[in-house]
């Protein structure tokens, strides 16, 4: 049975998703990575003459959701049955995209019919890549030529939808934004580079920089449309059978997901990282092995998209004057900048005392 990796290509109108789906699929197959694509469902509904106008917005998006869900379940089954170690499911939009077009209550109603909710869906995909609409940075290329069903007839409306889509996906475990700072061919190559890095080719590297900042304005963070708070509990264990690893609960209650992570240090900012989802029962079982737990930490993580860059800002219950913010990079010398609203104290990437394990051992409580 193959391990299935679910990757969503999303974004605003005329961002290049359809072309990107074909391009990434071809390139992954060149790398001998079995890939199954799922094309955009909305265009198929519209082609059949079904629209929000003649069906009503709720009924249209409910049917769209059910169509997507059925196809996703079927393609997931097929991917699992493939005779390979890992298979990629590549989506032109995921189940959560329709949330950008309906109210919170409407989405909760039709997702709830299948025992799903926003948080569970957001965490069900392994990576999400947002292709920014050409209406933001490549305005001369915006139009209906590539999609006769495109409904956003102004640049302003297209940018608004782009932000709405980005907002619903903010908080997913791995989100990257591909902007229009280059021509389209290079945009696709930048996307491929991000996808390949996520898949761990040639190695599953994590390159992060971490910064100590002054305690943020929480009210301001909550006002940012592309910001989402995720409660996190993580524990560090060293067991006789599995050695050193980390387990993490991301979210709360029945909306939580559980992840096991093994990291191998390469340099101060570069590590090999191997992550796998685990069940709540596995998480609880690990946590019950108190003799092997070396530290536990709880924090609120604010996932933020600012200036087309994804940041993770962590607020800890034991600090009232400071916090940390991290950014993940593709290379050690990649240029970066921090959001203008954070007040930098200093970079602490290379300071052992600010690693999560050290904080867990100093401040954490079981």
Language-model features, listed with the residues they occupy:
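Conserved lysine of the Walker
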Residues: 17
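ATP-dependent NMP and nucleoside kinases share a basic, alpha-helical "lid"
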Residues: 91-155, 159
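Phosphate-end processing signature that detects enzymes handling 5′-triphosphorylated RNA
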Residues: 185-186, 192-366
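Conserved nucleotide-sensing/catalytic segment adjacent to the nucleotide-binding pocket
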Residues: 50-109
